[in-house]
Swiss-Prot record:
<feature type="region of interest" description="G2">
    <location>
        <begin position="287"/>
        <end position="291"/>
    </location>
</feature>
<dbReference type="Pfam" id="PF04760">
    <property type="entry name" value="IF2_N"/>
</dbReference>
<feature type="region of interest" description="Disordered">
    <location>
        <begin position="26"/>
        <end position="167"/>
    </location>
</feature>
<feature type="region of interest" description="G5">
    <location>
        <begin position="398"/>
        <end position="400"/>
    </location>
</feature>
<dbReference type="InterPro" id="IPR006847">
    <property type="entry name" value="IF2_N"/>
</dbReference>
<feature type="region of interest" description="G1">
    <location>
        <begin position="262"/>
        <end position="269"/>
    </location>
</feature>
<feature type="binding site">
    <location>
        <begin position="262"/>
        <end position="269"/>
    </location>
    <ligand>
        <name>GTP</name>
    </ligand>
</feature>
<dbReference type="Pfam" id="PF11987">
    <property type="entry name" value="IF-2"/>
</dbReference>
<dbReference type="InterPro" id="IPR005225">
    <property type="entry name" value="Small_GTP-bd"/>
</dbReference>
<feature type="binding site">
    <location>
        <begin position="308"/>
        <end position="312"/>
    </location>
    <ligand>
        <name>GTP</name>
    </ligand>
</feature>
<keyword id="KW-0396">Initiation factor</keyword>
<dbReference type="InterPro" id="IPR000795">
    <property type="entry name" value="T_Tr_GTP-bd_dom"/>
</dbReference>
<comment type="similarity">
    <text>Belongs to the TRAFAC class translation factor GTPase superfamily. Classic translation factor GTPase family. IF-2 subfamily.</text>
</comment>
<feature type="domain" description="tr-type G">
    <location>
        <begin position="253"/>
        <end position="422"/>
    </location>
</feature>
<keyword id="KW-0648">Protein biosynthesis</keyword>
<dbReference type="Pfam" id="PF22042">
    <property type="entry name" value="EF-G_D2"/>
</dbReference>
<dbReference type="InterPro" id="IPR004161">
    <property type="entry name" value="EFTu-like_2"/>
</dbReference>
Length: 752
């Protein structure tokens, strides 16, 4: 049988719970309060004790009644006092417990009233004067006791019944919850949780964090299942972006996103303008005004999104930040010029992004155009047309006259159909930033491309390391719109700060979560800036290989002549150590420029220069981004250095430290001295004991030592930036105006 509560048993016996608690404790039952439980045997024992006590109490009332009858024969003064006393008892009736305690002394009290009857026989004024204070205290005591009695009677008549909400079927918890958190989930008070755990042998307070085992123990005691909730990092928008991308429910076909790339003056801008005006204006009444660097073209009842990127560097920067928003790359090559250096760069960037390439051979209307030569040159870069057995689409066009543009659009739609581009428009929007700027009138303005879901005005959004709410949204024509579907470029406002091109964005359900995610990402970005992650270098290559972090070593080769490029490339590709191979991602002739450094940063590559030097901008960019540039004049030294680095055998080496540059402004001839170069120190300083290198058009001509260094006919030890000087190079006279003389020192650097 089930246990019974003390207060329920007291209600049944019509006696105060406190009296029943005292009675149970006298029997050694160890009852603490009216909420304590007793066994059925103990309850029966208490019932018998309570009934026996009530019989005794009733019998004890009989002598009192007899005494009351006998007292009626007393004198008139005592009789008056008894009447007054009975009236007071009627108004202030005492509980049964008090009557029982006083019933044994009833006769004695009445006798005292008889013996002291003369004392009460005085006047009313005397009664109030001598005994008024005593009766007032007695009345107050009676009133207080009666109030408690009424409260107990109400409690006995209407006992408090706690109506708990039903327990959940599964307790979903996270490690570290306290009693208050669990109470909200279980629909129980924190005090009950603490008491329950106390009964289970766990001493806690309401604010103390609980471990996984304790929470599961509590759930087992309640008879429900416990399941740990997986905490999602709301600031990890990259994972959220991937989850949105991988959501295959309710997917529909979306427009293709196309980027047009090519060499300068090959007609890229003309092609974009022709497509925009011929296929957009017919759908826009009154013409258009291009507002952003992205637009959509209507063709054959389908949409194609074109991105007008400012250059290859921007394309690579976006890919370096993880944004691969391009589906198809259109490579524009002029039929009269053929493949040019920027054409090769565009090919390498597109191949690194793993996007299909459609070749648009432009300017076929010009005299001297030779499309077949373009096809032959592109075949060297694995761009083989379908006519030759390859899989690359070639289209011969004339952007100036609009010839075969429809065929180009047909090929884009065909390629998009083969790619099966789909997106879910019914989920939260996610996408990437194409470009961003700070507008004085509107604040932070960002051009974004929606890749998944539908973006609405008013959506809470996190973009890169900033957040906000979409305040306004305009299309490429400057017209305000309320929503943007997948593959639609729009310009939005409402962000707290200006994001960077290539940053991803994700829409959240509420602004509070978006704010928390944005602030956390900004904090992490600041911490990451303080502890910048270094790129791979030949010094740390072997340690990186041992950790299993590298399977290939990406290398960019720049040399003074094509023969050196090919020889160095072939030799490096033959090196293979412990399953790690060399991957030549770009090779070209000329000085190391900014584009090479940008590509190295995006691909985590090492740049090897043979008889060439980096430009000033490229060197600054490489230093700021920790890009490893290795310069050599002997091809075998370059090969040996890479091989030793892969084998982990690099010894401490002397590293070159450039201390200054001098630009030659004027040349003087002296019969005894030779050629004297007069110039300006453009950066750093030049010292008398420094080694020098003569660079002409980015190519190293000579390396040696200074013969002399003078300023105003005086020999000096050094000349700083911004001052003119005269110098000679020992045993070398072939110096020309506009040459650059680099001063450097060799510094011993241990291998890291």
């Amino acid at each position: 049988m089930a246990k019974e509560r003390i207060y329920e048993l007291a209600k049944e016996l019509k006696m105060p719970s406190k009296d029943l608690v005292n009675m149970a404790n006298r029997q050694g039952m160890g009852v603490k309060s009216h909420m304590s439980s007793v066994t059925p045997d103990q309850a029966q024992q208490l019932r018998q004790l309570a009934k026996g006590g009530q019989k005794t109490t009733n019998n004890q009332h009989q002598p009192v009644k007899k005494n009351d009858g006998h007292n009626k024969q007393n004198n008139h003064q005592a009789q008056n006092h008894n009447q007054h006393h009975d009236h007071d008892k009627t108004q202030n009736e005492r509980p049964q417990k008090k009557n029982n305690s006083r019933s044994n002394n009833g006769t004695k009290d009445n006798n005292q009233h008889q013996n002291n009857g003369g004392r009460f026989g005085g006047s009313l004024n005397n009664d109030q004067g001598r005994n008024g204070k005593r009766f007032n205290k007695k009345n107050k005591k009676n009133k207080k006791h009666n109030k408690n009695k009424r409260l107990r009677e109400v409690a006995h008549k209407q006992p408090t019944q706690r109506k708990d909400k039903p327990l959940p079927e599964v307790l979903e918890y996270t490690d570290g919850m306290n009693a208050q958190d669990l109470g909200k989930i279980l629909h129980r008070s924190p005090a009950e949780i603490v008491k329950k755990l106390f009964m289970l042998g766990v001493m806690i307070n309401q604010n103390q964090s609980l471990d996984k085992d304790t929470i599961e123990l509590l759930a087992t005691d309640y008879g429900i299942e416990a399941k740990e909730k997986v905490q999602v990092d709301v600031s990890d928008i990259d994972k959220m972006f991937e989850d949105e991308q991988n959501n295959t429910e309710h997917q529909v076909t979306r427009p293709a996103v196309v980027t047009v790339m090519g060499h300068v003056d090959h007609g890229k801008t003309t092609l974009l303008d022709k497509l925009r005006h011929s296929h957009v204006t017919e759908h826009e009444a009154g013409g258009i005004t291009q507002e952003i660097g992205a637009y959509q073209v209507h063709y054959n009842d389908q949409l194609i999104t074109f991105l007008d990127t400012p250059g290859h560097a921007a394309f690579t920067e976006m890919r370096a930040r993880g944004a691969n928003i391009t589906d198809i790359t259109v490579l524009v090559v002029a039929a009269d010029d053929g493949v040019m250096p920027q054409t090769v760069e565009a090919i390498h960037h597109a191949q690194a992004a793993q996007t299909p390439i459609i070749v648009a051979v432009n300017k076929i209307d010009k005299p001297g155009a030779n499309p077949d030569r373009v096809t032959e040159e592109l075949a060297k870069y694995n761009l083989i047309p379908e006519d030759w057995g390859g899989d690359t689409i070639f289209v011969k066009i004339s952007a100036k006259f609009g010839k075969n543009l429809d065929e180009l659009l047909d090929m884009i739609l065909l390629q998009a159909e083969m790619l099966e581009l789909k997106a879910n428009p019914d989920q939260n929007a996610a996408g990437s930033v194409v470009e961003a700027r700070l507008d004085q009138g509107r604040g932070s303005v960002a051009t974004v491309l929606v890749q998944q879901g539908t973006l609405h005005v008013g959506d809470p959004i996190v973009v890169g390391n900033t957040f906000g709410r979409v305040r306004t949204m305009t299309n490429e024509n400057g017209r305000r719109i309320k929503e943007a579907t997948p593959s639609t470029p729009v310009e939005i406002t409402g962000l707290n700060e200006v994001p960077e091109a290539g940053d991803r964005f994700v829409v959240f359900d509420d602004e509070k979560t978006a704010r928390a995610a944005g602030e956390e990402r900004a904090k992490r970005a600041m911490d990451k800036e303080r502890q910048k992650t270094s790129h791979v270098t030949l010094d740390n290559l072997f340690a990186t290989m041992k950790k299993g972090q590298m399977k290939t070593l990406p290398i960019i080769i720049k040399a003074d002549v094509q023969g050196s490029v090919e020889a160095l490339s072939q030799s490096l590709q033959k090196i293979k150590v412990d399953g790690v191979r060399v991957d030549i991602i770009h090779q070209a002739v000329g000085a190391i420029n900014q584009s090479d450094v940008t590509l190295a940063e995006a691909s985590n590559a090492v740049i090897i220069g043979f008889n060439v030097r980096p430009t000033a901008v490229a060197k600054t960019l490489a230093d700021s981004n920790s890009i490893d540039i290795r310069l050599h004049r002997v091809i075998y030294d370059a090969i040996e250095e890479v091989e030793d680095a892969m084998k982990g055998m690099l010894e401490p080496v002397y590293k070159e430290e450039t201390i200054g540059q001098v630009e030659v402004r004027q040349i003087y001839k002296a019969s005894k001295v030779g050629t004297i170069a007069g110039g300006m120190v453009t950066s750093g300083k030049i010292t008398r004991d420094a080694k020098v290198r003569l660079v002409r058009d980015g190519v190293v001509i000579y390396e040696g030592e200074l013969g002399s260094l003078k300023r105003f006919k005086d020999d000096v030890k050094e000349v700083k930036q911004g001052y003119e000087c005269g110098l000679t190079i020992e045993n070398y006279n072939d110096i020309k105006e506009m040459d650059v003389i680099e001063a450097y020192k060799m510094k011993e650097v241990p291998v890291k």
